């Protein structure tokens, strides 16, 4: 939609809104429904090397395994929407394997999910920045496509250290929790594109995140409640919100 387009890692997106990796992307049909909606990109549900059934409640990593999603990708090509393949490994080698497979399968951006509480980088909700760096370094060396790193919530004092590690290995996109935008944006200082996730349910939320430095936002809970039509609604609200702020400026 005019005025709402953006770029992530130099890739043009028709809209700054997209789904979060766990929302409306778990079956073969749901990514197709997203591709036909007003979303700016289709984020495939976080994949692991093998199927995970009855994973730890709330961890978000229950999935049928990456081969299932690789089979979905071919059907999405015709839609023309950029594809983000989200991956989670339990070793650095698994992250490399998963990212490489998506890089070979027409995925424009690979998202490294380092935020889930059962992955080694964030075991029990405590982020190990040395482990984060080991993963991003290995994947960057093996994968030529743009990389987005989804980080867990961090203490404010740790944000600068995390950003330094991402910059060191030429990561293109940082995905952070929306409440931490005010901390991440100045630390990144434009070196990486910033994407917000969490708590975006209307145009006002989206405008707030974008005005605090995000180039795009991911929508999860609102999408699950309303379905893919949520993107058109939030887009219209975002346009109205921008008009209000432009008038009052």
Regions from the PLM with identified roles:
Residues 32-37, 41, 90-195, 203-219:
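Alpha/beta enzyme core
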Residues 46-49, 178-179, 221-224:
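Short, acidic/turn-prone active-site loops that include or flank metal/cofactor-
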Residues 20-22, 151, 197:
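Short His-Asn-centered micro-motif
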Residues 200:
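Short donor-sugar binding/catalytic loops of nucleotide-sugar-dependent glycosyltransferases
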Residues 65, 189, 227-230:
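Glycine-centered helix-coil hinge/cap
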Residues 52-57, 210, 216, 221-249:
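C-terminal helical cap(s) of enzyme catalytic domains, especially alpha/beta-barrels
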Residues 1-83, 88-90, 234:
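N-terminal capping/small domains of soluble enzymes
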Residues 77-80, 106, 140-143, 188, ...:
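Structural signal for hydrophobic packing residues in well-ordered secondary-structure cores
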